[in-house]
Curated annotation (Swiss-Prot):
Misc: Cyanobacteria usually contain more than 2 copies of the psbA gene.
A GO BP annotation: photosynthetic electron transport in photosystem II
TM region positions: 29-46, 118-133, 142-156, 197-218, 274-288
UniProt xrefs under InterPro entries: D1/D2, Photo_II_D1/D2_sf, Photo_RC_L/M, Photo_RC_L/M_CS, PSII_D1
Positions annotated to bind a quinone: H215, S264, F265
Subunit structure comment from the entry: PSII is composed of 1 copy each of membrane proteins PsbA, PsbB, PsbC, PsbD, PsbE, PsbF, PsbH, PsbI, PsbJ, PsbK, PsbL, PsbM, PsbT, PsbX, PsbY, PsbZ, Psb30/Ycf12, peripheral proteins PsbO, CyanoQ (PsbQ), PsbU, PsbV and a large number of cofactors. It forms dimeric complexes.
Binding site for chlorophyll a ChlzD1: H118
Residues that coordinate or bind pheophytin a: Y126
The name this protein goes by in its record: Photosystem II protein D1 1
Record's cofactor remark: The D1/D2 heterodimer binds P680, chlorophylls that are the primary electron donor of PSII, and subsequent electron acceptors. It shares a non-heme iron and each subunit binds pheophytin, quinone, additional chlorophylls, carotenoids and lipids. D1 provides most of the ligands for the Mn4-Ca-O5 cluster of the oxygen-evolving complex (OEC). There is also a Cl(-1) ion associated with D1 and D2, which is required for oxygen evolution. The PSII complex binds additional chlorophylls, carotenoids and specific lipids.
Domain of life per record: Bacteria
GO CC terms of this entry: photosystem II; plasma membrane-derived thylakoid membrane
Purpose of the protein: Photosystem II (PSII) is a light-driven water:plastoquinone oxidoreductase that uses light energy to abstract electrons from H(2)O, generating O(2) and a proton gradient subsequently used for ATP formation. It consists of a core antenna complex that captures photons, and an electron transfer chain that converts photonic excitation into a charge separation. The D1/D2 (PsbA/PsbD) reaction center heterodimer binds P680, the primary electron donor of PSII as well as several subsequent electron acceptors.
Amino acid sequence: MTTTQLGLQEQSLWSRFCCWITSTSNRLYIGWFGVLMIPTLLTATTCFIIAFIAAPPVDIDGIREPIAGSLLYGNNIITAAVVPSSNAIGLHFYPIWEAHSLDEWLYNGGPYQLIVFHFLIGIFCYLGRQWELSYRLGMRPWICVAYSAPVAAATATLLIYSIGQGSFSDGLPLGISGTFNFMLVLQAEHNVLMHPFHMLGVAGVFGGALFAAMHGSLVTSSLIRETTEVESQNQGYKFGQEEETYNIVAAHGYFGRLIFQYASFNNSRALHFFLGAWPVVGIWFAALAVCCFAFNLNGFNFNQSILDAQGRPVSTWADVINRANIGFEVMHERNVHNFPLDLASGDAQMVALNAPAIEG
């Protein structure tokens, strides 16, 4: 009898926990994905803050010349970063217990893997939590579909690129100037600007910003006034009101006359789908571009593709970009002292045909 009562009590406690986790009445929805999201994001955030402030230098190239990335080792908020794991580690999973000591783990950049893996798990769970809450509320699932674009971009940059290049040392440094360094190296090694997927990503991000500004300004300019001239028009809106807050017919007429008729949407649902889909698809392509770079499917090479009647190359902007890429690549590997393949793969030039005679 006692065993039965304990079982019922435990079941009741578990049922209450399940109801609390999945309740949409909480101020913040937790959900089953949140059970994993909260500890992983807290772990990633805590480790990032500590490493950004106080992590010792990391031997990123695996040649015993460590790079200092934290604030306490002389960096400022612009130059500080969590330095990627050492090239000596490569793609090996490197948790704390794999190192002989904590000092060794820090020297080889262990915090980078800890932060990246926990962060990725956290944002995956955040995506799942968005779907879960939409499901509980009876909403359509497109919010998590839209969020999949930045999740795909983060996954491609932090994980797929490192896997394709064969080492986490090629990953994105977690800092401001480290991000810029990563971008320059990515351009040098993969000709990012000449890749069509990157071009689509740029069109998605900048186009999305343009369309958002156009939509916001049109709506703000065609609000239905519910207040006097001396009051803010925002006071005329009541949360949850059934009436339209702006005149879509006026906005449609204005924009159709400003450009041409069919450039303007006459369906509010189609308009907002377009506003959501354009940047999402663009960022999907940007993530695909990074996945291509990971496996060295680089941008187009149009170097010296135009020749004059004598066969001499006529320089284009593609050649200008190529010269910049070579310069970036020469500066990239600080202590390896290797020439970029563009310079090292040419035919050997004879500098002396006859050795001078040495009089003994």
